[in-house]
Amino acid sequence: MKTPLRYPGGKSRAVKHILPFIPEGVERVCSPFFGGGSVELALASRGVQVFGYDKMKQLVWFWQGVCGDNNRLADEVEKLQEQYVIRSKKTVKGCSKKSFHQYRKDLMTESFMFSYERAAKYYAINRASFSGATFSGGWSERASYAR
């Protein structure tokens, strides 16, 4: 499985070079800086039990959604897209610049508790920002509508 996130410093292109250095027979991996999780997902697909942690709460919420009920998370992402289509009366799916800034504001000011809606908002801004730089990067029209 490939990571669904774009993540600064991500290892998606390096996975094939990193995995040979993981000894055979490893049963568990603890990742204190999970981020986009490329290496960890590759290990999990081999049956390795992965414990992932990260300081960024919003990123953790996203992964909680994926590991909890990924169908519900997908439904929440779809709901965000449908709300945009209804509000803007446009048929294109993506994350508008206005929505991008609103979602970022929501994630920085709302309660710091997990919800599938917050996890979906994190995913939306990750996919719509330059190189996945969610809170430090800006909105990218190309990134937003290309995914």
Where are the model-predicted features located?
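Class I S-adenosyl-L-methionine-dependent methyltransferase module
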Residues: 46-147
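S-adenosyl-L-methionine
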Residues: 1-34, 38-39, 43-45
